[in-house]
Each structure stands twice: as C-alpha cells, then as structure tokens.
C-alpha cells in the first residue's frame, strides 16, 4: 500500500489567517469567539460566533472572486497558503496526477437569500449569472479547481460537520489506490446569520453566554448549553510519500489511519456506537499508541458525553490526553475537520497541546478521562487522532503520525 503524508497547509479562521498566528493563539489559549451584532439585530437567541476578519475583495482577483461565496473564498485563500507552504511548482499543481477534494456544509445561504430577494423585488433577469456557482453544492471544489488549473480529480464532499475530514480521508485513498500522487484536501464554511438562524431555531447554539462571548464554547463544562458557530477555510496538501521525498518536501505527518462510518440511528442525536466503530476502523492500521485526541467536542449537552462514552469504550483505561479545540475556535461546520487536522499538525510541530477552555466545573460524566483544561507544554506528540461527526449520523476519524524520516 502506498504511504501518504501531509506536505503543506493553509488556514483561514477566527483564530488567525495563517499557521503561525493560529499556532500562537492555540498555545496561548486565546479564543476567537466574539459578539456578533448581526445576530442580535436579526433576533437570534445566540449572539456569538467565530467570525473571520478579512476583506475578501481586496485579497482575491475580481475575475476569480465573482464566482465565489465566502466558503469558497476562504478555501481559496487557504489553498494559496498551502501551495506556498508545500513548495509545489505550477507544473506539479496543474498535472493529471494532482487533484482536489474539498467541500462545505452549506455553500452560501447569503447568496441564496439575496437571489430570492432579487427575484421578488426586481425579477429573474436581475439575479445575475454568478449565483449558481456561489450556491451549488460543489462550490468549493469548482471555485478552486478552475483558477488553480487542477487536472486530476475534482469534486466536493458534503457530509455536514465531517465534510473536510472525509475530504482528507478520500484524498488519502485516491493516493493509496494509485490514482493520484497529490491531492489538495479540505473545505470552507460561510458564517452568516442566514445559516446560523437555522441552527438557532433548532436550539443547537449557545445562548446563555452572550455577555461573555469568549466563554460561550465550553466543551465538557457542566453548564455548556450548545455550540458556537464559526466560519473559515482550510486546505492540506496530501501527497504520496515517495513523491514527497523525491522533491525534498517538508513532511508534517503521515496519515496512518482513517475511519468513516454511519450511526444509522437519528438525524441529529449521535448514537455513540457509530463513533466507536469509526475510531476502531481508523486505529486498525495504526501500530503506535495515541498521544492526543482532538475530540469533536462541540459543547452540546448530549454530543460531548456520547463521544466520551465512545472514547472510553475504545481506549479503556489507556485513554490519551483529550481536548476540544472548539472551545477556542467555535464550530466551523464543513471546515471543522480540516481546521482541527491542522490544529493537530501545529501542536505536533510546536510540542504542545491546547487545552479545552472554559471548563469551570467538569461534567461528572467525563471526569474519569484525562481532559486537559490548560495548555500542556513540552508535549511529545508522535501520533494524534482527530474526530469529526455530523448530523445524519456521519462520522470521520483521522490518525496522524509524526514522520521520523
């Protein structure tokens, strides 16, 4: 079986818009969650979010940007970073052996809303020709593959909050099967009240910490009350090992495990059993102990406990250090999987583990496991696991191992 490594990364998030800033904020335990005035103005019960601070029109050429909503734009900027980080040449990028798998959870509800408003107020001819590419399910892969001249595989996966983790896993499998040598993998997510209101309406978002936004996302705290929605994008360069070595690439880690399962249980409530099978599937190809687990840990009362019960079942009394970076970053939905894979890579590189922030009182249901509440320095991370689960009972687990050379 061909071995697969990660040789580049790029990130746009509420924790920063480059890897160094993100790493520093993770290490310092600085959350990126703020008060969102538009949520309050529109009457949402949740007034907090993890918003990206960028002027997209200034950063992306107009001829490229006109086809994009925010999700695609965030992923585009992340891909620019990942390409630079990887050292790939234009000839290696635009090559039949180089592909792209990237998606989002919700494309662009803002553009859908604006198109409908235009239809009602001015008629169909005034909608314009660019709304389709901004709102279609494959907007992220389409809006990246064209400007970057991708010639290999080119498609999106949309699997709710597991989206970009599945994209990374699928990229690994494309390379293992010999169909590609390099695959850009990841995703993006727009953060706008037009999508956030849907989660607010179902009672999924945090509402009790509007006056203290930085404390609203609090996985494993006894008084957590829902997740904090976020936006952003991330891309990683997934590459066949020998191809990477031949060109002298920097190797962040080897992807040694990938699990993908379905609960087959409930549309929104996790079974826990599906997550167990997912982690077990990912671990089946791993020959080393897990040093750190970045949980899905969204700060919901039900979801956090269900996942931890699964962790207990999989690891027994040998559970690794555990934290949820969503306590700092919020939940970027379709971008969460790649964001958290990147967080793991940055922690592995920097020798630290970001703690689960805002745990004032640890939930008794999870108190028997080694959940870190503060940053752990001088952490030797050789093998790490990251979980991403989504509505509809979809699950993804990635295991990354330090490349020893």
From Swiss-Prot:
The active site is at 161 (for beta-ketoacyl synthase activity), 296 (for beta-ketoacyl synthase activity), 331 (for beta-ketoacyl synthase activity). One of its GO terms (molecular function) is 3-oxoacyl-[acyl-carrier-protein] synthase activity. It is found in: Cytoplasm. GO terms for biological process: fatty acid biosynthetic process. The keyword Cytoplasm applies. It catalyses: a fatty acyl-[ACP] + malonyl-[ACP] + H(+) = a 3-oxoacyl-[ACP] + holo-[ACP] + CO2; (3Z)-decenoyl-[ACP] + malonyl-[ACP] + H(+) = 3-oxo-(5Z)-dodecenoyl-[ACP] + holo-[ACP] + CO2. The keyword ATP-binding does not apply. Disulfide bonds: none annotated. Its EC number is 2.3.1.41. Residues 1-402 form the Ketosynthase family 3 (KS3) domain. InterPro entries: Beta-ketoacyl_synthase, Ketoacyl_synth_AS, Ketoacyl_synth_C, Ketoacyl_synth_N, PKS_Beta-ketoAc_synthase_dom, Thiolase-like. It holds the Pfam family Ketoacyl-synt_C. One of its GO terms (cellular component) is cytosol. Keywords: Acyltransferase, Cytoplasm, Fatty acid biosynthesis, Fatty acid metabolism, Lipid biosynthesis, Lipid metabolism, Transferase. It is an enzyme of class 2 (transferase). Pathway: Lipid metabolism; fatty acid biosynthesis. Homodimer. NCBIfam families: PRK07314.1, PRK07967.1. Belongs to the thiolase-like superfamily. Beta-ketoacyl-ACP synthases family. Involved in the type II fatty acid elongation cycle. Catalyzes the elongation of a wide range of acyl-ACP by the addition of two carbons from malonyl-ACP to an acyl acceptor. Can also use unsaturated fatty acids. Catalyzes a key reaction in unsaturated fatty acid (UFA) synthesis, the elongation of the cis-3-decenoyl-ACP produced by FabA. This is 3-oxoacyl-[acyl-carrier-protein] synthase 1. The gene is fabB.
């Amino acid at each position: 079986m061909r071995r697969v490594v990660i040789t580049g990364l790029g990130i746009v998030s509420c924790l920063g818009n480059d890897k160094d800033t993100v790493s520093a904020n993770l290490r310092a335990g600085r959350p990126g969650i703020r008060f969102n005035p538009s949520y309050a103005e529109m009457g949402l019960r949740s007034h907090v979010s993890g918003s990206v601070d960028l002027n997209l029109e200034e950063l992306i050429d107009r001829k490229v940007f006109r086809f994009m909503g925010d999700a695609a734009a965030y992923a585009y900027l992340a891909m620019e970073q990942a390409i630079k980080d990887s050292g790939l040449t234009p000839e290696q990028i635009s090559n039949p052996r180089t592909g792209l798998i990237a998606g989002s959870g919700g494309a662009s509800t803002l553009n859908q809303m604006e198109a409908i408003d235009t239809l009602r107020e001015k008629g169909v001819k005034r909608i314009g020709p660019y709304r389709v590419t901004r709102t279609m399910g494959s907007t992220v892969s389409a809006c990246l593959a064209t400007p970057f001249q991708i010639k290999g595989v080119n498609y999106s996966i949309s699997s709710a909050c597991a989206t970009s983790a599945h994209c990374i896993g699928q990229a690994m499998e494309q390379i293992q099967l010999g169909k590609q040598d390099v695959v850009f993998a990841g995703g993006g997510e727009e953060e706008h009240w037009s999508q956030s209101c849907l989660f607010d309406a179902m009672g999924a978002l945090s509402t009790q910490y509007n006056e203290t936004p930085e404390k609203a996302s609090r996985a494993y705290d006894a008084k957590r009350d829902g997740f904090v929605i976020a936006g952003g994008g991330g891309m990683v360069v997934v590459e066949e090992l020998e191809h990477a070595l031949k060109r002298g690439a920097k190797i962040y880690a080897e992807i040694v495990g990938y699990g993908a399962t379905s609960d087959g249980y409930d549309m929104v409530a996790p079974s826990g059993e599906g997550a167990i099978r997912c982690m077990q599937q990912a671990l089946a190809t791993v020959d080393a102990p897990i040093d750190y687990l970045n949980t899905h840990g969204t700060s919901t009362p039900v979801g956090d406990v269900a996942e931890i019960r699964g962790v207990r079942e999989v690891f027994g009394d040998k559970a690794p250090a555990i934290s949820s970076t969503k306590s700092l970053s919020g939940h970027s939905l379709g971008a969460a999987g790649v964001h958290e894979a990147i967080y793991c890579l940055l922690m592995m590189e920097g020798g630290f583990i970001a703690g689960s922030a805002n745990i004032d009182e640890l939930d008794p249901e999870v108190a028997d496991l080694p959940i870190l509440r503060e940053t752990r320095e001088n952490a030797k991370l050789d093998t790490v696991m990251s979980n991403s689960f989504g509505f509809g009972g979809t699950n993804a687990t990635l295991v990354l191992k330090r490349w020893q050379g």
